[in-house]
């Protein structure tokens, strides 16, 4: 995030910056960790509109991948060792 980012953007960027390859979190977990519980939709909008963040490591609360980007997200997650089946992250 650039220095002129909002406090919310900065907090989300910090959370995303701590994610390691193969680590998957939900939009809600990112929002809560950033100090904004309940702001899961705002996290989604921010990821949609921002470049350079590991968006593929963030999924819905049910493990579903980003609509319209499922193939790319599954490929990126698979390259990091994350199992995906039927458009969802598979635990284990």
Predicted regions and their residues:
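Nucleic acid-binding interface residues in structured DNA/RNA-binding domains
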Residues: 1-92
